[in-house]
């Protein structure tokens, strides 16, 4: 939503043309539809292979003239079909200061470990798990043990940070 709003305000010289979501019932699908963004919501189990649904995604990206893919909450490892077609044009936002706490449940793992400095990382997507070249990072301190509070603070930072980073990439 923050990216669409920034595009609509002219803050980012781009247009969000497509939302791809691997959870058809996710609230983001309804939000995107309200904002007039085309949606492709799929369930991986409806496809025989990862390559099959990634080919469908590539077709949709190509037919919509997509130049940059911005992942958010996409909890799947990007596969070879998508990387071959769009490598170097896919970014991801992750709720930790990578390379620490890569993968799923990053915030929960960090809280369990006793971390006091949390953060957000935006990175290029490659064939590793959250291992692509880092584009931007922002840290924040939190001295509690509530993962939900860390997520809440992090999401406030993410919205502004992703917009700023996309602007820089597109310049």
What name fits each language-model region?
Residues 33-41:
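Short, conserved SAM-binding/catalytic segment
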Residues 1-5, 55-62, 160-163, 167:
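Amphipathic, non-transmembrane alpha-helical secondary structure
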Residues 27, 56-57, 77-78:
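Short acidic active-site motifs
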Residues 15-18, 38, 67-68, 89:
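Proline-centered loop/turn at the N-terminus of a beta-strand
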Residues 6, 22, 68, 72-171:
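Donor/substrate-binding cores of folate-linked one-carbon enzymes
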